[in-house]
């Protein structure tokens, strides 16, 4: 997990690399450290190891080096996931989603096996002003999920479709 709250969810290791973490991005050292963490988890004999990444897996803008997702890139290289579940926002542009899918499908040998559509609208200004996120109506989410699934050929989940998502993950790893 990349968040301290990961321990609340049973994470075996925490590598904070989000906003204000203080972890500098020294790629080689980061990759070695995370790879050692992965090994310490692997020797416990789990069938599946879940890894969470910070948002913005690819940059929205190249106008500021602070927007480059270098830590996320290093973490992907260090963990080499077999499968990805890409979480997207309702308002994310389809070309951005497509770039993210292409990136994840090419950086390591893994592939995007599912998309999870976040059911709240949070614009940047509202986030800065600490406003509550707004629920997106289920029929709008459903239509967007169908559209994304059709466009990308990847199952799309939203709301409480956790059992279907788990089934997709299990089927992927049973192949």
What are the residue ranges of the model-derived segments?
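Flexible phosphate-sensing "switch/lid" loops adjacent to ATP/NTP-binding sites
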Residues: 1-175
């Amino acid at each position: 997990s990349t968040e301290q709250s990961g321990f609340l969810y049973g994470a075996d290791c925490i590598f904070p690399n989000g906003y204000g973490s203080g972890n500098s991005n020294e790629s080689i050292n980061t990759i070695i450290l995370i790879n050692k963490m992965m090994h310490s988890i692997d020797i416990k004999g789990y069938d599946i190891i879940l890894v969470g990444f910070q948002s913005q897996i690819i940059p929205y803008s190249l106008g500021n080096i602070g927007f480059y997702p270098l830590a996320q890139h290093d973490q992907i290289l260090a963990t080499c996931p077999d499968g990805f579940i890409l979480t997207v926002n309702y308002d994310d542009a389809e070309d951005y989603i497509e770039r993210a899918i292409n990136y994840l499908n090419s950086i390591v040998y893994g592939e995007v096996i599912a998309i999870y559509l976040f059911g709240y609208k949070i614009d940047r200004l509202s986030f800065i002003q600490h406003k509550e996120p707004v629920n997106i109506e289920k029929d709008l989410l459903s239509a967007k999920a169908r559209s994304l699934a059709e466009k990308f050929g990847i199952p799309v989940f939203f709301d409480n479709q956790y059992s279907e998502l788990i089934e997709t993950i299990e089927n992927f790893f049973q192949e």
